[in-house]
Amino acid sequence: MPLNCIPSTVTVEAYEQKRASFADGMWVDVGTWGGVVPGNASSLVPMLAEGARGFKCFLCDSGVDEFPPVDEAQLRVAMTELKRVGGMLMFHAEMETGASVDGDQDPTEYATFLNSRPPAMEVKAIDLVVNLCREFGTVPCHIVHLSAADALPAIRAAKAEGLPLTVETCFHYLTISAEEVPTCSTEYKCCPPIRGQSNRDLLWEAVLDGTIDFVVSDHSPCTPDLKLHPCCGGKIAHGATEGDFVGAWGGIASVGIGLPLLWTEGKRRGLSLQDVARLVCEHTARHAGLGDRKGRIAVGLDADFVVWDPEEDNLIDAEKLHFRNKLTPYHERPCKGLVHQTVVRGSVVYDISQVDDSHSWENGFSKAPCGQWIDSPISRQ
């Protein structure tokens, strides 16, 4: 993503800096998205020429000063540029509706935060996206991390109209409901928020009927102090409240465990392994313009796959996860399915038989990273 880095990826120079920082340190192939912010429309086509897969924008405060939101007029300027070359624009689809936190509400209760970001924020934003998608016609538009099922009717109508609109949701929206979030447990905070069980069921219906095109992690970790989490033992910013959902960093950490999470919940709802492959591999590769290289096991494509046992018990242990800041809502969650090996372009880059007791994030990885930077031409096949 273009904003969880310094500098944000909103110019060609920032894109090149990010690419250089990844050199010789990747176990998987990596590409990046550029960002649309006020005033950078002239940088979009040059970033595409360098290899950016497309662009992301925010319709509300991103929480990052270097990545401000864009308004409707600024979107039109950006989409005019993207229309010249068929570039994709992805939307963090929330817009302000006037909802706020009442000063009398307890910020350590999840409901306080949830009520501050009602479904109407997503519905308002997605209505705008649909209108712009219709107006600009050939600009592929994508809704990232859909949370509110209230927006599904507008999405279904846009797709029935034949507009170039796609939509994703996330593992956490499909596997967690608001009713189960404990007090002070800020590891559950993300934006848009995890909503109630009935909303979750409607999202699943949209996954199963194809309204939602694919499922992703939206992995957004941070240090526990930024989460204002009780595990910090009071070591948080001066004046901050421990366990404050409103003030905590928003983001769910789940990279590497999405497959068992989706499979465990999806299997009982009628999801097949073929469906899982389509939702997390084939459609995501096509979305990133890599459908001619990745996303399927087929002659001529990159040999990227995992070797896993879909029936093996898997109790998620945060300390064994393969990322640095391990605060996650999935700690001690029982799942079905365990990855034994990960293969990238035919090379084994992870092998569970090589895992030891070190709890290092690279535990079990191959000694020599073989990942490549992806800047190949975009394919929509």
Briefly describe each language-model feature range.
Residues 14-22, 105-118, 147-167, 222-252, ...:
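Short, electropositive alpha-helical surface patch
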Residues 110-138, 187, 214, 221-311:
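His/Asp/Glu-enriched, well-ordered alpha-helical/loop segment
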Residues 30, 55, 92, 141, ...:
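Divalent metal-coordination and catalytic microenvironments
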Residues 3-6, 60, 94-95, 146, ...:
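Short, ordered loop/turn segments at secondary-structure junctions
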Residues 34-41:
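Active-site beta->alpha loop and helix N-cap motifs at the rims of alpha/beta catalytic domains
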Residues 232-244, 299-374:
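C-terminal cap of metal-dependent C-N hydrolases
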Residues 42-57, 61-215, 231-235:
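Histidine/acidic residue-rich metal-binding segments in metalloenzymes
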Residues 1-25:
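Metal-associated gating/positioning segment near the N- to mid-region
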